[in-house]
A protein has these predicted regions:
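Glyoxalase I/VOC metalloenzyme domain signal
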Residues: 1-120, 127-217
Length: 217
């Protein structure tokens, strides 16, 4: 699972990363062909990433992220008109993405070089982890390392590469989202006062592998 971060210019982002000694791949154009189309449409996005194995003396992202530019906003307007941006659980957007890492300080150095700004510290007792928040537009990336060898986060890292362990999704109607989640899972979801507002939590067993926090401001 990867996090794609929307940027205003893939070209400018790639140029900046190169000045910071990153082994950059892209900008690479991409598009989707609809059924029946025989000719690829013009590029609908441009993506920028770093090499999986950076060249000697070069940097690369070791958490699963990439940058993406959508040259035109027409796709979103069309999707909204077709109702494809509306969700039965009233989800508005993914506000925060939580990454399980071995060494927060090391990741912070790399991501600061990439232009991200570090924010507050964060302790997550449920995962037995602590770390730092990084600002990402109107949302956040949260880097977490294990606080003890038997923690939930440490168990995750024993079977995975560094990656996304949890998401915080904002909803417009928490009660409706909670009712829908309880109906689908067959279990009761208790609410709590979370970092971003009143929240409830879905376990990885119900979400194909990640903790999913839903909250309402």
């Amino acid at each position: 699972m990867f996090l794609g971060l929307n940027v205003s210019s893939a070209k400018v982002a790639a140029s900046y990363l190169r000045t910071q000694n990153f082994d950059v791949e892209g900008p690479d154009p991409g598009s989707l062909m609809k059924e029946g189309e025989t000719k690829p449409p013009p590029p609908q996005w441009y993506s920028v990433g770093t090499a999986d194995k950076p060249a000697p003396n070069k940097q690369g992202f070791s958490v699963p992220i990439f940058l993406i530019e959508y040259p035109s906003g027409d796709w979103y307007d069309k999707a909204r008109k077709e109702g494809r941006t509306e969700h039965p659980n009233t989800a508005i957007d993914i506000h925060a993405v939580w990454f399980a890492v071995h060494d927060v300080k090391s990741q912070l150095r790399t991501l600061r070089d990439a232009g991200f700004e570090a924010d507050e510290s964060r302790d997550v007792k449920l995962l037995g982890a602590h770390g730092r928040v990084l600002k990402a537009g109107s949302g956040a990336m949260i880097l977490l390392e294990s606080s003890d060898k038997s923690s939930v986060l440490q168990k995750y890292l024993s079977g995975h590469d560094e990656g996304i362990i949890a998401l915080s999704v904002e909803v417009s109607d928490l009660r409706k989202a909670q009712s829908m989640a309880e109906s689908v899972t067959g279990g009761k979801m208790d609410t709590y006062k979370g970092t971003y507002g009143k929240s409830f939590l879905l376990s990885p067993d119900a979400t194909h592998g990640v903790w999913l926090e839903m909250f309402q401001r």
